[in-house]
């Protein structure tokens, strides 16, 4: 049986709910969902593996005033969540996380022998992944990197540049070439990250197998035709073009609901004043967004397909959209395999006029046709991209490492 230590910032659902509700600056939740789905996928393979986490507590001085953080381990879905205590101050936090995580990873690797043990590291969490990687090198334990973004192309988190970003990017880049295997979002990533041709797996995303039980019924749809965008609200992500295109649509029954953080937050009041059909909800809990998606007519991802970073990303929102059973309209992103194309509507013209035309055509379709199209997308991702299926593929990768 494989024993897996999952190193990231992942929290149990109850711990995350507490951190989210007490945060003065609400964090994006997509990376938490990505990691939790994979870990829960491992936990569903009880006969072949056992998984526990080693997690940096995802707090910053900007999000929480509390300085000393020491959280007890907790259990959820047969997963033990272990948290690294720290002091929530610049530099001090990262140093403490590195030191404590290093010794915890050493102890985990040596306790009971190294046989059949493997460590998975989220390389974008530099302090804790660097500590775990060093521990693995010293104990000769295999370490696999999970790469959800490339440091020098990140739009999230460290957007404003400066010394902090440069240090983060250099450390991440220096470390990411030293793993024994890689879990990547796109094939293009492999050319950049896997310079030593180690075993790797392309896993562009995953969906919650439990969504099979979530009913998406025509009778439960909102009486208005709601279009939802949930994600980072950045002009570079195509959000401004989406809004401009929507404002050209005619129909008082149409709505555009926007969820998420980003640089365009400050512009939202102006857009809502110009067009009362537009509503901005900020950052809300993921389960609330999922419920709203079930009631919507269309889910959209306007991210530009010509930006360099799109070669190395597959937005988790596309997977979340598809498993909801509500149809999705997206740009033809380079990182999206062709197998997805029959199950999504495409913005083939990525101008404001092109977005407007595509939205107009889709929203004119009968609701039954939209519902059937969304249902086929849901069945596709549940069959081929569920967290149980993807976790099994990762377990197969471990045999090659």
Describe each region flagged by the PLM:
Residues 35-40, 103-110, 127-130, 134-139, ...:
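Membrane-proximal helix-turn-helix segments that form the acceptor-binding/catalytic region
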Residues 266-293, 298:
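Nucleotide-activated donor-binding/catalytic signature segment of Leloir-type glycosyltransferases, i.e.
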């Amino acid at each position: 049986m494989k024993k897996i230590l999952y190193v990231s910032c992942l929290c149990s659902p109850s711990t995350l709910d507490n951190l989210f509700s007490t945060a003065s600056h609400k964090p994006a939740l997509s990376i938490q969902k990505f990691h939790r789905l994979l870990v829960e996928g491992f936990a569903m393979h009880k006969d072949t593996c056992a998984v526990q986490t080693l997690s940096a507590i995802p707090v910053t001085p900007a999000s929480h005033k509390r300085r000393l953080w020491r959280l007890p381990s907790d259990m959820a879905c047969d997963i033990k969540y272990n948290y690294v205590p720290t002091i929530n101050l610049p530099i001090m936090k990262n140093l403490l996380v590195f030191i404590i995580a290093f010794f915890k990873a050493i102890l985990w690797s040596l306790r009971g022998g190294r046989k059949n043990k493997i460590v998975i590291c989220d390389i974008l969490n530099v302090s804790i992944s660097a500590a775990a990687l060093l521990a693995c090198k010293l104990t000769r334990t295999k370490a696999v990197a999970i790469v959800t973004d490339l440091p020098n192309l990140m739009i999230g988190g460290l957007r404003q540049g400066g010394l902090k970003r440069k240090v983060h990017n250099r450390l991440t880049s220096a470390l990411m070439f030293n793993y024994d295997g890689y879990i990547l979002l796109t094939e293009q990533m492999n050319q950049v990250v896997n310079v030593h041709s180690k075993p790797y797996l392309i896993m562009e995303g995953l969906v919650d197998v439990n969504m099979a039980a979530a009913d998406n019924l025509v009778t439960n749809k909102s009486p208005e035709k709601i279009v939802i965008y949930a994600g980072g609200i950045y002009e570079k992500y195509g959000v401004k073009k989406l809004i401009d295109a929507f404002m050209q649509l005619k129909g008082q029954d149409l709505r555009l609901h926007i969820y998420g953080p980003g640089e365009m937050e400050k512009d939202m009041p102006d857009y809502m004043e110009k067009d009362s059909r537009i509503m901005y909800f900020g950052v809300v809990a993921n389960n609330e967004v999922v419920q709203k998606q079930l009631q919507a007519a269309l889910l959209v991802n306007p991210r530009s397909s010509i930006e360099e970073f799109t070669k190395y990303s597959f937005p988790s929102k596309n997977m979340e959209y598809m498993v909801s059973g509500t149809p999705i309209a997206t740009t033809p992103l380079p990182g999206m395999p062709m197998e997805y194309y029959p199950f999504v509507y495409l913005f083939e013209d990525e101008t404001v006029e092109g977005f407007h035309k595509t939205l107009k055509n889709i929203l004119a379709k009968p609701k039954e046709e939209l519902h059937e199209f969304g249902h086929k997308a849901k069945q596709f991702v549940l069959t081929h991209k569920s967290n149980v299926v993807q976790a099994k593929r990762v377990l197969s990768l471990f045999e090659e490492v």
